[in-house]
């Protein structure tokens, strides 16, 4: 999908890429942005570290599920559909220039998807919390994020149209993966 996006971006002389969806869609937009700006190198070569990207088209994100935090992170995960191998690439070139984060765009999600998003936010937060480095401030922020996600997740799963809980989850998801907590 990302390779097709690169072809379309090159064909249309795109100067910007927008990912509207969740983490996978936004990560795909990031890959397209890197691929189009570094053509003719195949994007997978960046994710396998065979090559280093030096440029990227600007990326914007429109978030429709609170989960991965890709809307504010410098990382992107891709899966090579031919091999099934999944890899991540962290570079400031990946960080979106802007993110539209309107909780109303998440209110049609089924409760199961809301719960999956809550779990994803918690995992990103715990990844950073349980690292060997001690930092009282970032640990306290991570603990606050976990408390918030647990409390608001319970509300959101029962009532995905609760603006406040969906807003809190959206904010927590972004903070869990933007580098603030390690």
Model-based region annotation:
Residues 37-136:
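A glycine/threonine-rich phosphate-anchoring loop and its flanking beta-alpha core
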Residues 1-40, 155-166:
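N-terminal small/polar loop signature for handling phosphorylated ligands or for N-terminal nucleophile
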Residues 1-5, 13, 28, 118-121, ...:
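General structural feature for long, well-ordered alpha-helical segments within catalytic domains
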Residues 18, 28, 61-62, 101, ...:
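General beta-strand structural signal in soluble alpha/beta enzymes
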Residues 128-182:
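Active-site segments that bind and position negatively charged phosphate/pyrophosphate groups
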Residues 17-20, 60, 176-177:
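Short glycine-rich or small-residue beta-strand-to-loop segments that form or flank ligand, phosphate
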